[in-house]
């Protein structure tokens, strides 16, 4: 689906693969939250992969990492404690599809829909700020 949309809309600059994380065990679930303006939100985690040896054909990994760092910085500036540490490692999920492709985890299965939705709205503001400035 992503490739079909990229072909149909070649001006797409950002592809976000959005998920909920799974942390903990069945007996001990983790619910990462922060509070902004008196309202609880699900903490987010941005994942940025790399391909330092060129084996995966993931040429844009450095640009994606730079984009991830900008979003992380903007989100923390606007909404302190919104983000968990950026996850940077030798993986590529769907981040290789184009420059500006990232995987973002919004909370976990233990967070409420309201917490995840609130964070999604704040995250959208942070991403828009990065793209427009």
Task: Describe the function of each predicted region.
Residues 1-5, 32, 53-62, 105-114:
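Second-shell loop/turn segments in exported
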Residues 1-33:
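Catalytic-core regions of hydrolytic enzymes
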Residues 9-14, 42-43, 81-82, 99-100:
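Loop/turn elements at helix/coil->beta-strand transitions in domains of secreted/extracellular proteins
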Residues 14-17, 45-48, 85, 102-105:
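Structural recognition of the beta-strand scaffold that forms the well-ordered cores
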Residues 20-25, 51-54, 91-94, 108-112:
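Solvent-exposed loop/turn segments at secondary-structure junctions
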Residues 23-57:
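A short, glycine/acidic-enriched catalytic loop
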Residues 60-87:
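Active-site-adjacent substrate-binding region
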Residues 84-133:
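Active-site-adjacent mobile loop/cap segments within catalytic or ligand-binding domains
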């Amino acid at each position: 689906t992503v490739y079909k949309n990229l072909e149909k809309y070649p001006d797409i600059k950002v592809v976000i693969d959005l998920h909920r994380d799974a942390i903990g065990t069945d007996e001990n679930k983790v619910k990462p939250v922060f509070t902004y303006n008196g309202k609880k939100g699900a903490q987010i985690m941005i994942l940025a992969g790399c391909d330092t040896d060129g084996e995966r054909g993931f040429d844009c990994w450095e640009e994606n990492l730079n984009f991830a760092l900008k979003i992380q910085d903007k989100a923390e500036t606007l909404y302190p404690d919104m983000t968990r540490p950026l996850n940077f490692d030798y993986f590529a999920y769907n981040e290789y599809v184009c420059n500006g492709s990232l995987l973002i985890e919004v909370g976990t299965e233990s967070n409420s829909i309201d917490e995840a939705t609130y964070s999604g709205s704040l995250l959208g503001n942070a991403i828009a700020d990065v793209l427009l400035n």
